[in-house]
Amino acid sequence: MERNDIQANAPIKQACLFEGVLAAPPAGNIKKMRAAKAIRQHEWHRYIGMWTPYEMPLKSLVDSVNRRGIGVEVYTCLTSGVEDAIDRWLARKGVAVPVYQFENIYEIHAEMKFHSPSMRIHVATEEQAQLLGLRARVASPHKEWVL
């Protein structure tokens, strides 16, 4: 209830981690060397462009935002400054959502206290899910998201 406006259903909101949920870091020796050079030179757009997208989670993200109208936020624990590059990467995939950078998963856990209780966050590993609690769901790179 907000401002005496009673709704039949609570707005659903989702969040997901960029790394491990929406994309995989560069693999292979040559790609890793190029990625390391891009990081050293702070060329974040080039670095994020080297990441391999996970098709099913990206389709789930696009569907959630564009068809269902569900608000989604993307979180990253990569180095500061990559938010704009991730935002552009997502825009090229067909979705515009807010991207937030955190130093580590513990900061995300602290931030979750201020979000809606119905919010779900999709993470890459079981350890991250255990840390974030009941709101977290481990997302497979080969399957759709489940609310």
Give the location of each predicted region.
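C-terminal cap/substrate-recognition subdomain and adjoining C-terminal extension
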Residues: 68, 79-147
